[in-house]
């Protein structure tokens, strides 16, 4: 009996020791994984002060594999496009994809002799397509380096769209190439145990920016101690003017004369935290106000009359014409195959920025869903009477959010109003509520009833209300407004709260327009809206340098990104009124967002 007890005790001790060892090993592994993740995040912040030297400095010249886009040694696939419009031809893009597929089938490609193509689909001038196979399942991490002490390395983990990001077949875009310089691309292949299998470095000369974009922005480092967020700044900006001289034949004698033509070139630009240009997405004569990831594609305005979907390799999957309409602001996706676009009808006497059209991704059908001239008929009629023209710019839709089934929130800049509209799919859309200064709607009795009341919050609600008699004795004046409503707002975002009927609405209050008490500042506003109570409350307010036209602000947990359009700059700051970093531009930006593109270009 004693012998059995002894055996049991020894067994238990061994099991405890074994379990402890396993837990220690697991904790040690978890710690190492966490440390590696933090190291990767630091490396991907694209800041010189956080990088220990440059990747290219560690590579011997003899080990660099040169890539050539032209000449006798050409080993990079290149594609010619006659125009930006041709880039966004889905048929042209499909033909290019078919050509690359044929090349892949006819030859075996390893990392040493990988298939390279420079911007094959024309949709990103700062990217290279690469394809190769490995013997085992693995993933790739790449670094873009240039011999310039002022430009940091750009490092990311490529996404393979395979389980655990491990695959034997590697096909991705190397992003972040620097325009106008010799770029050194180092690809590191890791096995399933995160062990480095092989490293190769390639060199390639990248052309200058076609759009005339600044290769490096002038930056100012602020006093904030907050760590700058990871990601790329997505800049929607006014186009740069280019002057060309053309020969024009005219007159009976058909004399050739020189004619000066001024055109603007537009592009969506991607900048890193150091202000270095890392992406240039060309657009045709127009730059939109936002882009959206829809399934495995990015959608953005490729021209004033078209929206395009582009996959992670840069291929144009589909381009949708907005038949009969021009884009005039944002678009938004409802999650069910429908895109809603702020638009202007192409008719001669159409009111600008007054329509919302629906684009069905399934078949490209375009249908007008909201006409503000009809929805706010009394306001429109008064504007027509005052201006004596039917195509008066009276409403200025500039932002749109889908907030429920057949429901949307619209921002009308000219009216300094946020308008929630329902019954979008019906012939008679209706207004659920309006957020605006009450005095703006006093002339319109039916609309005035839709304006939500301001709430001072729970603390004010707990205060005892004075009786009429006491008010009369003390001659107490009417309680002042708890806050000023927004005027001339831009870039609205909507988030549903868990409490039924409640939502958070964030926006840039430009603090400009009719009826405003101007003080030279714009503001970040966050409202708590309670539809059930018919109220809205100002929960957050941050003062900013004023921009009266365009601009936006996106709020994060520790920081925000603010685009000051009038000031021609954008800034990342903390919530203690301190700048983390400011970026100065040579032309007016419309909007600036920050995205890490994880799950699309990067893992």
Where are these regions (language model features)?
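Ser/Thr/Pro/Gly-rich low-complexity linker/stalk segments immediately outside membranes or between
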Residues: 26-51, 55
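Short alpha-helical hairpin
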Residues: 145-149
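Solvent-exposed serine/threonine-rich low-complexity stretches and specific carbohydrate-binding patches
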Residues: 150-165
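Hydrophobic alpha-helical membrane-insertion segments, chiefly the h-region
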Residues: 15-26
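Long lumenal/extracellular ectodomains of secretory and single-pass membrane proteins
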Residues: 49-84
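Compositionally biased, low-complexity repeat tracts
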Residues: 49, 67-71, 160-164, 400, ...
